[in-house]
Every structure is written in structure tokens, then in C-alpha cells.
């Protein structure tokens, strides 16, 4: 990348190719975009456009085949497995479309469980209240 920006997230010519030498599937083809800190962004597109792949790359759950993925000035595209684990644990939050909760724990207990691996855990009750779940703290 040649120019400096104040982007919090920056993808520069990111590609993701799955498959073998004989069969290649290009899931993401040299995409570039920037997101400023605090900016609200929606990723939309038709099925198969690469939305999930891009989110998985940003979330550190998949790695780009090529390009740069900068988050807060750090190129996570160059992270090894251990660094990506730390990034997922300490720097990023992900809400999956099909999430898995521990069924015999309440909403509050599920969040408290996840916070046990955080360096600087937030208050579970406060977090749930902030996302509109104040009345469901004790729901299973």
C-alpha cells in the first residue's frame, strides 16, 4: 500500500482462492475497501459473492490467499495460527448467524463463560443490557 490512511480496517487487493491445482474457486477477487473507526458498515451482495469469506478473513477465522488485511494498523493477513487465536480472543467479537450457546446456562451465564478467556472482561450484565437483552438475563 502506498498511501497512509486513518482507516481502522483496510483490505487491499485481498483474494481468497479455494481448491486444488486442477480446480480453483475464487471466493474473493482482489477486493479493496476501508472502514473508519466507529463507522457502521453493512456488507451486502448476492449469494456466493464472498460476503461470508470476507467476514471470516476479518474475523481471523480464515486467511487471505493474497493481499493485505489491516486492522488498527496490524496486518492480520501475515499472522500465524497462534497470533490469529490471540486476535480472535482479544481483539474481535463475532455474532454468528447460527450461534451455539450452552443450553443449560442462562443468557447471562453464557456471556460470563465467554468472558472468562478475556484479558479485560466487560461486565456481562451491562453488555447484555446494552444490546437490549436486559429482560432476558435469566432466559435459557
Residue ranges with predicted function:
Residues 44-46:
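The feature captures the beta-strand-to-loop junction immediately N-terminal to the Walker
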Residues 68-70, 74:
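ATP-binding/catalytic-site motifs of ATP-hydrolyzing domains
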Residues 103-112:
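Short coil-to-helix segment of the ABC ATPase nucleotide-binding domain corresponding to the Q-loop/switch region
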Amino acid at each position: 500500500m502506498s498511501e497512509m490512511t486513518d482507516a481502522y480496517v483496510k483490505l487491499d487487493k485481498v483474494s481468497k482462492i479455494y481448491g486444488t491445482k486442477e480446480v480453483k474457486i475464487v471466493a474473493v477477487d482482489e477486493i479493496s475497501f476501508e472502514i473508519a473507526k466507529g463507522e457502521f458498515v453493512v456488507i451486502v451482495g448476492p449469494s456466493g459473492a464472498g460476503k461470508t469469506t470476507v467476514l471470516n478473513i476479518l474475523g481471523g477465522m480464515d486467511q487471505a490467499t493474497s493481499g493485505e488485511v489491516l486492522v488498527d494498523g496490524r496486518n492480520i493477513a501475515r499472522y500465524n495460527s497462534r497470533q490469529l487465536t490471540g486476535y480472535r480472543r482479544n481483539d474481535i467479537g463475532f455474532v454468528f448467524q447460527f450461534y451455539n450457546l450452552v443450553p443449560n446456562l442462562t443468557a447471562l451465564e453464557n456471556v460470563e463463560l465467554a468472558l472468562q478467556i478475556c484479558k479485560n472482561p466487560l461486565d456481562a450484565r451491562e453488555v447484555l443490557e446494552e444490546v437490549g437483552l436486559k429482560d432476558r438475563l435469566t432466559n435459557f
